[in-house]
Amino acid sequence: MLNREEELRFCKARRAAIALDYQNLNPEQRRAALATDGPLLLLAGAGSGKTTVLIHRIANLMKYGRGSDCDEAPAWAAPADLAFLEGYVQNPDPAQKAEQERLCRVDPAVPWSIIAITFTNKAAGELKERLERMLGPSANDIWASTFHSACVRILRRDIDRLGFTSSFTIYDTADSERVIKDIVKDFNLDEKAFAPRSILGYISRAKDAMKLGKDYLQECEKAGDYRLVKIAKVYAEYERRLREANALDFDDIILDTVRLLQNFDDVREYYQKKFRYVLIDEYQDTNNLQYLLASTLAGGYENICVVGDDDQSIYRFRGATIENILSFESQYKGARVIRLEQNYRSTKNILEASNAVIRNNEGRKGKELWTEHEAGDKVHCYTAMNEHDEAQFVAAQILAGFSAGRGWRDHAVLYRMNAQSNQLEQASSATASPTASSGASASSTGRRSRT
C-alpha cells in the first residue's frame, strides 16, 4: 500500500515513464498523444504532424490505456513499484521494459473500441497503413475509416429497422443524377430550369438538416415558393424510388445512420458502449449530419478527440459548418484544447506571410505557426489590374525562371477557381510554356496550368 504522498509520486513517475516512449514528438504533440480521458480539441496547423499525433495517441490508448492521464495509483502498488518507476525514469533499461509497461497500464483499450474517422479514402488508407506498421495485426480491428465507410458498416447490421435490407445498393452521383433526370422528365419539368445537379444540391442540403422528403415538401408548401415546391416533390419521388430499389445515395448513408442511432435506443447504446474512444479528423469540414454522428457515437464515454484547423475551413459550399469546431468547448464543458503550432513543412518566410494574412480572420481560435526551418526565399506580392494582367505576369515569371535554368516542372500555379485557368492557358500558350493539369478541365481543350 502507498500513502497519499507516494500515490502522487507514483502517478507522476508513471506519466514520465510513458512519455519516454514518445520522445520523438514535440512537447505539444506529446501532450496530445498522452491526453486520454474526456473531450479534446486538437487545433492542428498545416504541416504540424497531426496524423503522427493521431497514430501515437491510438498506440498509447492500446498500450497504456489511461495510464498517462490517470491521477490514481493502483490499489496493489507497493513502495517497491514506486521505486522501480522512479528509477526507470532516471535510467531507462530496455531489459526492464516489460515491467515498466505492466506498472504503467491502466485499463488499456482494445482495438475495436476505437473509431478514427477521416474524410478521404486516401487519408483513411494512410492512417490504417501507419497504424499497422506501429501496432501490427491488431491495428486491423480499429475502426479507421471515412465517415461513409463507418456508416455503411453500421447500416449493414441494422438498416432493416428503417425498411431497407442489408444488401442495399449505394448510388453514386451519376446514379442519383440519372434518377433525378427521369423524375424531371416524368413530371414534365423543364430540365434547363430544373437541372438535376442543382436539384441534388437542394436535396443534399435538406438531408443535412435531417429533413425527409415529406417534411421538406410541407415546409416548401408553407413558404409558398412555387419553384421549391416543385423541387420538394421531385425529392419526395426520388426518395420513394430509391427506397423501392433498396438503394441509398451518399447523403443517405450518413443521414440514415444518424436516424438509426437517434430512433432506436438499443442500437445507440450498443455503439456508445462499443466505442470508448472517438477520434474525428478534419473537424472543421464536418457538416451537421457528421457532427450529429460524432457526438452521438461519443455520447457514452465522451472520450472524443477532434482534430482540425479553423483557419483551413474552405468547404462551406459543401455544407461544412465552422461552428462545429468553434463551439466544441461550449458543447463539451471542461474540454482540453491543445495547439499544434510547430510546422515541419514550410520556411519561416512562408509562415510569416500566412500568419499575417490569417490573423485578420474574425472569430478564429487563434494560433501562430512557427518552424525551425531556415527563412527561405522571400514571398513576393504582385497586385494585378485584372485577370489578364495577372495571367501575363504569371507566364512571364515562369518564362524568366526557365531562362534562368529552372525546368518547366519546377513551377506550379495555384488558383482559387477553375474559371481562372482559361486566362492562364492563353498566357502560357503565348509563351510556348508546356502545362499539365490536375483536376477537371475548365476549358474545351483540356489544357490547364497545373495546380
Regions found by a protein language model. Give the residues of each.
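Conserved helicase NTPase motor core
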Residues: 13-18, 22-54, 73-88, 99, ...
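Short glycine-/polar-rich loops that comprise or flank the Walker A/P-loop
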Residues: 38, 109-113, 138-141, 179, ...
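Helicase P-loop NTPase motor core
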Residues: 51-54, 89-105, 333-336, 341-434
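Post-Walker A helix-loop "phosphate-sensing" segment adjacent to the P-loop in P-loop NTPases
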Residues: 61-70, 109, 136
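Conserved P-loop NTPase-based nucleic-acid remodeling module centered on helicase motor cores
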Residues: 111-201, 382, 395, 437
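Short regulatory helix/loop adjacent to the ATP-binding pocket of P-loop NTPases
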Residues: 153-160, 314-330, 354
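Coupling/switch/interface segments within P-loop NTPase motor domains and analogous charged loops
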Residues: 174-242
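Conserved short internal alpha-helix adjacent to the catalytic or cofactor-binding core
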Residues: 429-431, 436, 443-451
